Amino acid sequence: MALKPPYSPESGGASRSRTQTETVHFWEYLESLLDAADCTSEAQVNSALVAYVKTASERYGEYLVEDRDFYRVALLLLRAPLYERNKSFCISKMLSLLSIDLLEMSMKFVISYILLCECKADSSSLDHVLDYQGFTVIYNKLYEHFAYLHRYSDDEETTFEANITELDEEINEELRKISTVLLDLLFQILKYSKCELANLQRVDDFFVYYMMVSLRSDTVEDMYNNAKFRLLLALNEQYMISNHKAGLENKVYAYLMNHTASKQFVELLLLQFNRTVDKSLQIMMCKIIYLILTSRDEIAMDYFYLNDLHVVTDVLIRNLTNISEDEEVLRNTFLRILDLILRKTEWTQSHYREQELLELLEYLCSVDNLCSSGNVKSEHMSTTKLAFKCRQAIRQLKVEQKKSRDAAAAPAPRPKTPEPRFERTDSHMSVPMDKITRAIGRSPFASPPPPPPSRRV
C-alpha cells in the first residue's frame, strides 16, 4: 500500500518541529516514490523523478537541514533501480529542470546536489551531463547568481553600497550555497572530462572577473570561496591546454596581470599553497605561478613581495624534502618553479636559505638518493637534471656576486698623463754655430743688413 505524504500543507508546514516518528515517515515516503515496480515507461520514470525531487525540495530546511540529509536524498535516488536503469534520461531531466528560469532555489539546490554526487561517484556521468548541454546550463545559472550577487551583495570591496536588508542577505546566502555546488560541478567537468573549445569560449570576462575580485584571502575554510578559487585554477589549466590548439586568450592570466583585480587571488594562492595537501591542487597552483614567472622579466621580478617569495621558497623546500618516490612528477613540477624563482625574482638579491637549498639540490642530483629500488625511471632522471640546473643557477649567481664584490674592492687605477699633440725635441740646440752662420750667410748676432737703395725715378 502506498504511503501518504508526511503532512498536508494545512498541517502547519515547516513552522513547527517534527517528531522522530514524522521524520521516519518522511524518509519512508520519499523512498516509496522510487518504487521501480510502478515505472515501466519513460513517462512514468519522469513522473516518479519529478515527484521525488519536488517532495525533497518542499521539505528543504525542515527534514533536510544538514549536509548528511542532502547526501541521503542523493544516495536514495542514485541507488534506486529506477534510476540505474534510466540514468541518462534522469540526468537529462534534472538538467532540463535546472534550466528553468523561475525554478525555486530549494529545488535548484537539491538537483545540483544530486548531480554533483552522481558525477563524483561515477566520472563517466560527466559525459552524459555534457551530452545534454550541462556545461551551458550550469554556466548560465552561475552567471545569473554572480550578476545578482555583484549588484546586491557585499562580496566585493568595490560593490555599490546599497541598503541590504535581512531578507536580501538571506537570498544572497542561498545563492552562495547553490553556487558552491554548481561551482564544484563545473570544476569536475573542467578537471575530469574533455572540455570542448566552444564551452571554454562561452566563458566571458565578467564571469572570471567576479570570481577573482570577490575572493577572500583571510580564510581557507569558506566553501564558497574555495569553490571559486578551484574553478579559477581549473579554467587556467584549460586555457593553457587550448592555447596550444586554438590560441584562445587566457582570461585568468589577463586578470592576474591586473594587480587591482588579482590582489585577493594572489594572497589566497599563497595561503593555499602553504596549507593544501591535495596534490592535484598543488600542481594547478604551480601552473599559475609558472605563468607569472615566465612573463616579461620586469613583471616576474616585481610580481611577488619579498616576504611572499620567501613563503613560496619555504613551501618548495618542505615539499621537495617530503615527497615520496612515487610522486616524482610532482617533485619535477616544484623544481621547475624553484628554477624560475632562483633566476627571475628578487631571490637573486636576498639569497634566502641559500645554503639549505644547495644541500637539498646536491642530494637530489644523485639518482641513488631518489630511487632505492634501483628501478630508475625517466622521472628520476628529470629530477636530477632539474636539480642540477637549479644548483648551477645558485653557483653562477655566487660567482657573479663575487666578481661584483672584487670589482668594488679593487683600488681605482691612476689616471694616465695625456700625450702631447706634437713631440718636443731639443736637437737643434746642439747644432754648432758656424754651421748656422754658413747656412744663413751671416752671423745671427751681426747687425741687420742696410735697407735697399731708393729707386730712382
UniProtKB/Swiss-Prot annotation:
Cytoplasm is among the record's keywords: yes
Major localization listed first in the record, in broad terms: cytoplasm
InterPro entries hit by this protein: SPIN90/Ldb17 (IPR030125), SPIN90/Ldb17_LRD (IPR018556)
Domain of life assignment: Eukaryota
Ranges for region Disordered: 401-457
Gene Ontology BP, a term: actin cortical patch assembly
One example GO MF annotation: Arp2/3 complex binding
Subcellular location: Cytoplasm
Residue stretches of biased makeup (Basic and acidic residues): 416-427
Family label: Belongs to the LDB17 family.
Function comment: May be involved in protein-linked oligosaccharide phosphorylation.
PANTHER family: NCK-INTERACTING PROTEIN WITH SH3 DOMAIN (PTHR13357:SF1), SH3 ADAPTER PROTEIN SPIN90 NCK INTERACTING PROTEIN WITH SH3 DOMAIN (PTHR13357)
Protein name in UniProt: Protein LDB17
Annotated organism of origin: Eremothecium gossypii (strain ATCC 10895 / CBS 109.51 / FGSC 9923 / NRRL Y-1056)
